[in-house]
Structures are given as structure tokens and as C-alpha cells.
Amino acid sequence: WLLRRDGQSTIDLRVNCIPTIFGDDITMRLLDRDVGLMSLDHFEFQPREYDLLVSVLRRPSGLLLVTGPTGSGKTTTMYGCLQFLNDGSRKINTLEDPVEYVVKGIRQSQVNPKFGVDFPELLAACLRQSPDVIMIGEIRDPKTALTAVRAANSGHLVLATMHSPVAVKAIRAMVTFGVHPQNFAESLIGIISQRLVRKLCQRCRQRIDLPENDAFLDDVRPLLPHDWTPVLYEPGRCEECHNVGFTKPICVPEILPFDTELRRMVADCRPLVELDRAAHGSGMVTFRQAAMTRVALGQTTLQEVMRVVPFDDLRELEREEWEEPLRSAIRSASHSDGNGQPTAAL
């Protein structure tokens, strides 16, 4: 349903209902169509993150994957990328399930599996429309994966989402779909894996001392402003945030642009651990850097980072060197406030 509020925006209301032994279980999802259409400038990306993403989007062709679990903001990021590309110089087609936001100047199509029109069929038809940019709502089957790679290798810029916890694991997911590693490597220009953390209310956040052992911030110090003050923050309470301490969610992205060496490793089916190490050396923005930068700038808390970062997957990639220092920092920070006084653990 569409709910139009007098003098305000239009709300898209989606209702799902299933029967239970206690009665109907109803879930409602609200989408504010105006709020959802944000340009990349409003994503609060850090300068290096923004520059990396824009450098990928400026490529004339190739495949950009946006990955993460359900509710991690993938669709919002995709629309932000489309807004950046939608300057009138390109023909842009989207394949969505469903179309969540109507974007002027973009040709948007919606899948309808009941009538045999799913992503593979729509994508095949879309390629005959001579698009410059194709956005695929989700790669969830082998046929869509194969066609997306073929489109990216034939001169189209293809943006697609899929479920993958960290950037390099999207490679394994695509190969599992039956995509030939050589063809996939030739198409790949970047992978973004992301999570959402709650942003601290900037009006009532409470200052706390930086723990004595602040090694968990070592590799993000070069990314911070020169006048950065070494303090952290925890949530407070005020009317502006309805006494929650947090406001809107913000994106924590892991951004991996692909260069010649990384493509060679994908084509050679190198182990994910090796790919991940090479990605670190190629200039990717890691979850650690993105998350800790937002903590250091007072945008979120250490606890929020621990809540959303996929540590199990990072351990599999042998990226576990920051989990225990982070836990230690939380323990230290939870016992003192900005005046050196003890405070309750959060």
C-alpha cells in the first residue's frame, strides 16, 4: 500500500502475515520514498571510502557487487550509486524485486515470478535494450550470475547485490553459482560489503576517556583529522533521540577495488585467505578501518561495532588480531567516564 501524508512524503507500507496457533503474526515494513533516495554525499562516507567507491563507479564497464545480510542497507547503497551515475549521459536500466523507489530518468522493471518473469528473463531482455548501466536487485541463482558476468564483460556497467558476509567471500559465492573464475575475474571491478550501526545522538552523547591500551586505533590514526581529540563516546538520553541515545543508522563499508593482481588471483582460484591478504595490500578499506574511524569520530560506540561486525567470518580469513583488543577496550571504557569516574558497563 501507498500512504500519502498531507503535505508530506509518500510512505510505502508492506505487510506480511502468517498464521500461528495464537493468531495472525503480522510484520509491517515502512519505506519513506523520499528519505530513501540519498546521494552518495549524504552517506557519511569517509573521504578515502568515497574516493574508492567513486573510482569504481567511473569505470565504463564491469561488475560491482554490493553484499551483506538482509537489512544491511544494500538497496540504499545501490540507489545512491544510481543517483551518482544518473547524470543524463547514460541509459540506466534496473531489475528489481520489487521497485522500492521511483527514480526519474531511470528505466525500472520489476520481476514477476508468477508469470515466469524473474531476474534471468528480465536480464536477458534488458540486454537487448542497449543499456549502459544495469542494476540487478539480487543475484540469487546461477543463470542470473552467469548473465551478469557476461553483460559486464560485453561493455556494460553492472551493479548487483548478493548475500555475502565479507567482500572476498562474494567471490566464492559467485564461483559456487557456476561462474567460470576466468570470466568472473575479467568482469570484476569492485566489491562492497557493509553493515549498519546506530549513530550516536550528537546532542546528548557522553564523553568517556580513551582506554590506556588504545592499540585498536593504531591503523586508523592516519585516517583521522589532524586535530582529532583522543576521546570516545557512549549514548546519553534526550528528547531529540527519544531517550534512546542513538539516531539514524549509518553505513560501515568494506570497499575492495580490483586491480590486475587481484583479478589474476581470482582467475587462478587462489585461497580466500591469500586473496584477503593481497586485498589489504592493494588499498582496500577494511571493516576494521571503517568501524574504528566511526568510533574515533564519535559517530558510534565500540559496543555497536562488536554487535554488527562479522567476527566469525573475519576469523576464517585470519583477520582476528583486533577482536580481543576491542573487547579489552570495551571493558576498560565501561569502568570510567570522561572525568575518570567509574561508570556502569553498557
Question: Model-found features: residue ranges?
Answer:
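Short, flexible helix-loop junctions that flank or precede catalytic/ligand sites
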Residues: 1-346
